[in-house]
């Protein structure tokens, strides 16, 4: 369980920021037997084989377009994680307008384009499962406030969450409860403990990919050089992630 004590949605600010859970099953020596939400050295979420999971690579080598780009591949909001190729990511994802003459964007627009990090290209919201703060008002009360300001119900609805299913945590606010189901036959050793950590990324890998592949010019070249020469080893942001909370190893009962 995660409790949000920051007083607003988390992460907040620009929409490409994200937080994610790393959940590990450990043996008696502290070695990882199974993990969801592990990363590589550039901050991409990977599976047990070290392969980036769905939604981590928005662009391919030499800025080629991946086969799953048109389908807006991403990690959905989970209430139960059952595989190392799944990860709980708290984030907002938006998409571009579809490639046709007549397009309706904004409130209730259906995602049809590709995922984007450009504020100028936003047409529809794909996902918003950012953690709600304690005391987040339910929709009827948000509508009352919107009307008092002279705004419509759209404002109240758009300030909620998107694509979280029937998760009760997003009706009450305050955090998220999540279950990890680990098949015993997926473990190569004897499990002794589990550990959960919450990480934050202000600059996820896909944001940099999108900048480098969709923008040209000296500013982009400068950013590419800076990020390519940035040495985070041994820093609090090693592997392009910042630790927010850590449960420490929790022993598994008999």
Region roles according to the model:
Residues 1-254:
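Short, conserved sequence motifs used for protein processing/export or organelle targeting and
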